Regions:
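Compact, glycine-rich, soluble single-domain proteins
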Residues: 1-60, 65-67
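Acidic/glycine-rich phosphate/pyrophosphate-binding loops and surrounding catalytic core
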Residues: 49-106
Length: 106
């Protein structure tokens, strides 16, 4: 019987393998929180997408747009830190979607 140490942590956008009732799923998580208690783990995700619900072309386009925004922001002193963080979050969400679809990204 597995027991976990207590933990509450923020989740960044990423690909996550979730096992529930003996079934394993690969899911693109758009950020959120995870609470670990001795007997269970609870994930409160901003968004969660299964591979069959991900549009690859849309994810690739979002990835490219976010990369372009980040590169242009780095060369522009006018851009605010929040704009850069938003672009980085969009890039991470797109990357998670592509990884869940088994498409390699940088």
């Amino acid at each position: 019987d597995l027991k976990h140490a207590r933990l509450l942590t923020e989740l960044i956008p990423h690909a996550m393998r979730i096992k529930s009732e003996g079934t394993e799923h690969l899911v693109a998580i758009g950020g959120g929180f995870m609470e670990v208690t001795p007997d269970k783990i609870t994930i409160l995700a901003d968004s969660a997408e299964l591979p069959e619900n991900i549009d690859v072309d849309r994810a690739k386009s979002a990835y490219k747009r976010a990369e372009d925004r980040i590169n242009s922001y780095k060369n522009s002193p006018k851009e605010s830190e929040i704009d850069i963080r938003r672009a980085e979050a969009a890039l991470a969400r797109a990357k998670a979607r592509l990884l869940v679809k088994n498409i390699p990204v940088n």
